[in-house]
């Protein structure tokens, strides 16, 4: 495998399904907080394409993070069988269900470097609480300290995304069609997505606040790259105290409120129009029903009169016969 830096990691849906199945089979039954496995895929320049995976027996001590076990004999046997099926898929890294980094991840990553020099760690959250991607990719790098102390291993975040081939897209669409709730409207879905998005934004802001507090108290070293990126984010924020911004915000809010007010008026007029039409239709129906009843009464009355006239004529004929 070429010794190239990773710029992006593409995870296929098959990997996500395999990891969730692994966690449901082992994590819940064995009361394990996380499960570990191996990622298979290929390199395309600086993009890592993770197309397959398999589980690996793993155990660790809850109290001591330095005590852990990963069955590399099982790993080698499984990889040998996978290689017979598809020789293009190679070991490109490993995964665990996190949901965050652990202290012993560096040591596990060093073990995985025996099979893959540029081993990539992908944390897959099987129980996501916020709306967004359930994957986080990392690669180990040497961190140089400003105080002259020896370098140390640390993880650097890598951009990750979900990608699929045509066959996988068809399968995912089929699964989503089966579990999709057709009773939920598009408006409620949009509102739900916005609420989840705001919750995700709130959690990210809390993480930034926690990081800055730890840096300020000296619990974490200063990372100038992170500080510069946060400064860029703050520079992009609008100045809410600026008079022009306040005026523009009020104008836009008023315009939106006018649209909502007009929409409410239109709905009221349409509802009133429908009510009037319904009342007219009911009145016409009652009038038509009354006319039909009167016509039926007249027909019955005429029939009775005809019957009486017929009886009288019959009686007269009989009287004439008797006289003769």
From Swiss-Prot:
It comes from the Eukaryota. The modification N6-acetyllysine is found at residues 204, 214, 316-317. Gene3D superfamilies: Cytidine Deaminase, domain 2. Residues 281-324 are annotated as: Disordered. Pfam families: JAB (PF01398), MitMem_reg (PF13012). GO terms for cellular component: cytosol; extracellular exosome; extracellular region; ficolin-1-rich granule lumen; membrane; nucleoplasm; nucleus; proteasome complex. InterPro entries: EIF3F/CSN6-like_C, JAMM/MPN+_dom, MPN, MPN_RPN7_8. Coiled coil: none annotated. Keywords: Acetylation, Isopeptide bond, Proteasome, Ubl conjugation. Residues 9-144 form the MPN domain. Component of the 26S proteasome, a multiprotein complex involved in the ATP-dependent degradation of ubiquitinated proteins. This complex plays a key role in the maintenance of protein homeostasis by removing misfolded or damaged proteins, which could impair cellular functions, and by removing proteins whose functions are no longer required. Therefore, the proteasome participates in numerous cellular processes, including cell cycle progression, apoptosis, or DNA damage repair. Does not bind a metal ion. Component of the 19S proteasome regulatory particle complex. The 26S proteasome consists of a 20S core particle (CP) and two 19S regulatory subunits (RP). The regulatory particle is made of a lid composed of 9 subunits including PSMD7, a base containing 6 ATPases and few additional components. Within the complex, PSMD7 interacts with subunit PSMD4 through their respective MPN domain. Interacts with TRIM5. This is 26S proteasome non-ATPase regulatory subunit 7. The gene is PSMD7.
């Amino acid at each position: 495998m070429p010794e190239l830096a990773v710029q992006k990691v593409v995870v296929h849906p098959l990997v996500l399904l395999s990891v969730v199945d692994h966690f449901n089979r082992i994590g819940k039954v064995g009361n394990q907080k996380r499960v570990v496995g191996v990622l298979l895929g290929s390199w395309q320049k600086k993009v890592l394409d993770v197309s397959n995976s398999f589980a690996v027996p793993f155990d660790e001590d809850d109290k001591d993070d330095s005590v852990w076990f990963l069955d590399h004999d099982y790993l080698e046997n499984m990889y040998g069988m996978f290689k017979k099926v598809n020789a293009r898929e190679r070991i490109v890294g490993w995964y665990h269900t996190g949901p965050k980094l652990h202290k012993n991840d560096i040591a596990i990553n060093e073990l995985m470097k025996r099979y893959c020099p540029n081993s990539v760690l992908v944390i897959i959250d099987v129980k996501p609480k916020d709306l967004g991607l359930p994957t986080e990719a990392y690669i180990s790098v040497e961190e140089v300290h400003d105080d002259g102390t020896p370098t140390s291993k640390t993880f650097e975040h890598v951009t990750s995304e979900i990608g699929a081939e045509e066959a996988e897209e068809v399968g995912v669409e089929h699964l989503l069609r089966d579990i999709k709730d057709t009773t939920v409207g598009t408006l409620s879905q949009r509102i739900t997505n916005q609420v989840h998005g705001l919750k995700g934004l709130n959690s990210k802001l809390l993480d930034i606040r926690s990081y800055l507090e730890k840096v300020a108290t000296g619990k974490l070293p200063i990372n100038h790259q992170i500080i510069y990126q946060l400064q860029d984010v703050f520079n992009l924020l609008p100045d809410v105290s600026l008079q022009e911004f306040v005026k523009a915000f009020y104008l836009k809010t008023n315009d939106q409120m006018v649209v909502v007010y007009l929409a409410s008026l239109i709905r009221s007029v349409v509802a009133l129009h429908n009510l009037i039409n319904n009342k007219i239709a009911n009145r016409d129906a009652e009038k038509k029903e009354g006319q039909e009843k009167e016509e039926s009464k007249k027909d019955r009355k005429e029939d009775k009169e005809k019957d009486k006239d017929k009886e009288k004529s019959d009686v007269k004929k009989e009287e004439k016969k008797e006289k003769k």
